[in-house]
Amino acid sequence: MALRGWRLFGVAGTILVYVGGILFLSFVSLQGPQQKRGVHGPRGYGEFETIRNRDLGLMGKKPPLQWCTELHYLDAPIRTPRKPPKLLQTFPGHFVKKFNSKPELAALVSFPGSGNTWLRYLLQQATGILTGSVYKDYGLLKSGFPAESVANSSVLVVKTHEWGPHAWAPYTKAILLIRDPERAILAEFNRQSGGHVGFASPDRYRRTKGRYWTQFVKNKLWAWEQTNLSWAKNFTGEVKLVFYDDLVENVEGTLRSILKFLNYQTDEELLACALMRKEGIYRRKKRILQFDPYSPAMHAAIDEKRAEVYAALGRYDAH
């Protein structure tokens, strides 16, 4: 009887130990995540959100934009204030009067990679008016710029990267957005390789033993010069120069000056909202490369061309 009692006691003890072990493991597993949430709190959630947004980006989706007001086309074209007619000399000894008779159409001009899309975003936030483009970028069309390919006076400004008489013809005035060529060329290379907010992989710079990148820099530096000088010097309408660095440093002041140039009365409430949401999703985040993609010869060529163009535009304090 005594032996049998000890056996029953042993079995009961084993069962108790087994059940106790299960309960202990369950308690630990439940406590683990709770402690992690308690220690990290919002940070842990933020990391999850970052991963989720990044994954959506890989799938070609962007987080939804929040506009300060509903976007719309201009109800009526903005017209140039009545001014005395200008005397234009069509050939030696012959003058004609030029009247301001047509609605304004403003071009938003830049070399690619200079922040054109970001400035369009800021203008749409600050006015609620759609901006147009001579292009039809389906990515932009679906994510905040429904007036892609609209190039008439129903929009606030029209994006273009073109230059020359045919490109100037439709416009009465132009906003010329200028960015340092070294950064603009790099941004354009990233755009062609990774989209509006993506990046080129390091191996892209080494493609064809670097010859592709070398030729890209040479071609784009020439295009950067032509875009900026042709509009600044040869376009016959009014031109407002906007340097990208000034826009970054003083978003409010730059937006105010642009709206004044466009003869558009500033809405203080919308402007304040635009400044709160100034980053948006169309500005490429900074990324530090582990190498300098520009060779010494490239740097020298860029420095020389930058100095020439900036001097022609009256900018002497850059770089």
UniProtKB/Swiss-Prot annotation:
Its main location: membrane. Glycans are attached at residues 152, 228, 234. The chain crosses the membrane at residues 8-28. Keywords: Glycoprotein, Membrane, Transmembrane, Transmembrane helix. The keyword Membrane applies. Pfam families: Sulfotransfer_1 (PF00685). InterPro entries: P-loop_NTPase (IPR027417), Sialate-O-sulfotransferase (IPR051589), Sulfotransferase_dom (IPR000863). Disulfide bonds: none annotated. It is a single-pass membrane protein. One of its GO terms (cellular component) is membrane. One of its GO terms (molecular function) is sulfotransferase activity. It is found in: Membrane. Belongs to the WSCD family. This is WSCD family member AGAP003962. It comes from Anopheles gambiae (African malaria mosquito).
